[in-house]
Amino acid sequence: MPVTQDVFNEDGKFMRKIRSFVRREGRLTKGQEKALEELWPVMGIDFAPEPLDLVALFGREAPVVLEIGFGMGASLVEMAKNAPEKNFIGIEVHSPGVGACLGTAQEAGVTNLRVICHDAVEVLEHMIPNGSLACLQLFFPDPWHKSRHHKRRIVQPAFVQDIRQKLAIGGVFHMATDWENYAEHMLEVMSAAEGYENTSATGNWVPRPDWRPLTKFEQRGHRLGHGVWDLIFKRVN
């Protein structure tokens, strides 16, 4: 996942930044490179340490959905195509994924999607206006399954409060993971977080909503009997 988080000692002194992603840039295919060259001027957003004018960016006022870490972008493009009444922004640190997403969006005729290739924490802090998001999506983040790496997980108390600032009142933070231990970690962090309310009728997970497409990876997991956990928490104050 494309994020960094500050680490402080017990006295509150800054120590270092912890990265929650491993940079696996890989090589761009010719198609991805072509998509970046041709479509970035239309759908790409360059990082700048100032708030975006979201109405100007999309040329209209509409609910904004932000996804962190969209991978190759197939699901994000499908969601944007299926919800033309909403504006979508995707953040992904790996340029091959950004190129793939742009190409897929063009093929699908999607015009309500913009992408940013930068660290998500910095984008949230500097570019996303407070109270501007209808939904923030975090699907299948790196689980960092070894105990000594749990501190690298993106869903941490400070980060979910950063997200809360960016959500409108009534806006939702939607998470999904295929690691049960990480799902339990998410539930623990979110249940303790100020200003959020779990939308689950059972106080834990929600069924996969229709708007979140099944990924190929997820379909394979279902066939093998693997679980997937969705959590949706609403900002209430």
UniProtKB/Swiss-Prot annotation:
Catalytic activity: guanosine(46) in tRNA + S-adenosyl-L-methionine = N(7)-methylguanosine(46) in tRNA + S-adenosyl-L-homocysteine
Database matches in Gene3D superfamilies: Vaccinia Virus protein VP39
GO-annotated cellular components: tRNA methyltransferase complex
PROSITE patterns: SAM_MT_TRMB (PS51625)
Pathway assigned in UniProt: tRNA modification; N(7)-methylguanine-tRNA biosynthesis
UniProt KW Transcription regulation keyword: no
A GO term, aspect molecular function: tRNA (guanine(46)-N7)-methyltransferase activity
Residues binding substrate, per UniProt: K146, D178, T215, K216, F217, E218
Sorted UniProt keywords: Methyltransferase, S-adenosyl-L-methionine, Transferase, tRNA processing
Superkingdom classification of source: Bacteria
Active site per UniProt: D142
Pfam families cross-referenced by the UniProt entry: Methyltransf_4
EC nos: 2.1.1.33
InterPro entries noted in UniProt: SAM-dependent_MTases_sf (IPR029063), tRNA_(Gua-N-7)_MeTrfase_Trmb (IPR003358), tRNA_methyltr_TrmB_bact (IPR055361)
Binding site for S-adenosyl-L-methionine: E67, E92, D119, D142
PANTHER family: 3-DEOXY-D-MANNO-OCTULOSONIC-ACID TRANSFERASE/TRNA GUANINE-N 7 - -METHYLTRANSFERASE, PENTACOTRIPEPTIDE-REPEAT REGION OF PRORP DOMAIN-CONTAINING PROTEIN
Functional summary from the UniProt entry: Catalyzes the formation of N(7)-methylguanine at position 46 (m7G46) in tRNA.
HAMAP family: tRNA_methyltr_TrmB
Family as reported in the entry's similarity comment: Belongs to the class I-like SAM-binding methyltransferase superfamily. TrmB family.
UniProt name for this protein: tRNA (guanine-N(7)-)-methyltransferase
Species assigned in the record: Aeromonas hydrophila subsp. hydrophila (strain ATCC 7966 / DSM 30187 / BCRC 13018 / CCUG 14551 / JCM 1027 / KCTC 2358 / NCIMB 9240 / NCTC 8049)
